[in-house]
């Protein structure tokens, strides 16, 4: 089983306000990925989905979509706290995988996400989405790497774990899928 954790707990420091609620194409930013993932999970029997956040409106939005909502009160301290809150909510088994998807990548497609989920197989320790030599989120980790994920601190993500030689690169269809919205300017550019 692959457990998808949709990470929506960031502080939006560079954005100046909660970017997850900021409208993009008629929907709050976080809903783009959430809606795509919720629809994808409905077509597969090999994965679950949970949204992890400290924001009530975002948690309520997940519940309204029928998605499990995990409260992460310490997310303001950094991404590692959101990751741990999500992991704590799982009944992780030795053969399981965990996929981490960040909520500020509105152009990630179901096709690319399905390729990442398909990478969850014996012999694979981790996987990441890449385009043109640039790699980023989303990422996938085998349950065997959970101790390393729990050891993360502050705003550290799993980048160090992804340097392993048994880490698979999953192709995205375009560079736009890896675009994350961190500032109002990046949001305006994305909307163009």
Stretch-by-stretch model annotation:
Residues 82, 112, 145, 154-158, ...:
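Internal, well-ordered alpha-helical segments in soluble enzyme and binding-protein domains
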Residues 105, 137-140, 150, 178-179:
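A residue-level structural signature of the nucleotidyltransferase/glycosyltransferase Rossmann-like core
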Residues 136-147, 184:
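Conserved nucleotide-sugar donor-binding
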Residues 23-24, 140-142, 181-182, 190:
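Short beta-strand-to-turn element immediately C-terminal to the catalytic PLP-Schiff-base lysine
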Residues 151-192:
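Conserved alpha/beta core of the MobA/IspD/sugar-nucleotide pyrophosphorylase nucleotidyltransferase superfamily
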Residues 19, 149-152:
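Short, solvent-exposed loop/turn segments at secondary-structure boundaries
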Residues 2-103, 107-135, 143, 166-174:
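Nucleotide and nucleotide-moiety/phosphate-recognizing core
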């Amino acid at each position: 089983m692959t457990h998808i954790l949709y990470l929506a707990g960031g502080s939006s420091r560079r954005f100046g306000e909660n970017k997850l609620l900021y409208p993009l194409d008629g929907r709050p930013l976080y809903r783009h990925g959430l809606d795509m993932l919720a629809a994808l999970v409905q077509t597969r029997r090999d994965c679950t989905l949970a949204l992890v956040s400290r924001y009530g409106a975002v948690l309520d939005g997940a519940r309204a979509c029928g998605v499990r909502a995990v409260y992460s009160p310490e997310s303001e301290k950094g991404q590692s706290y959101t990751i741990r809150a999500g992991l704590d909510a799982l009944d992780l088994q030795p053969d399981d995988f965990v996929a981490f998807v960040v909520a500020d990548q509105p152009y990630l497609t179901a096709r690319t996400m399905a390729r990442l989920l398909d990478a969850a197989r014996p012999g694979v320790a981790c996987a990441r989405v890449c385009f043109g030599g640039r790699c980023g989120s989303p990422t996938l980790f085998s349950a065997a790497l959970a101790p390393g994920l729990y050891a993360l601190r502050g705003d550290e993500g799993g980048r160090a774990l992804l340097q392993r030689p048994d880490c698979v690169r999953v192709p995205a269809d375009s560079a736009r899928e890896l675009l994350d919205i961190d500032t109002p300017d990046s949001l305006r550019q994305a909307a163009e």
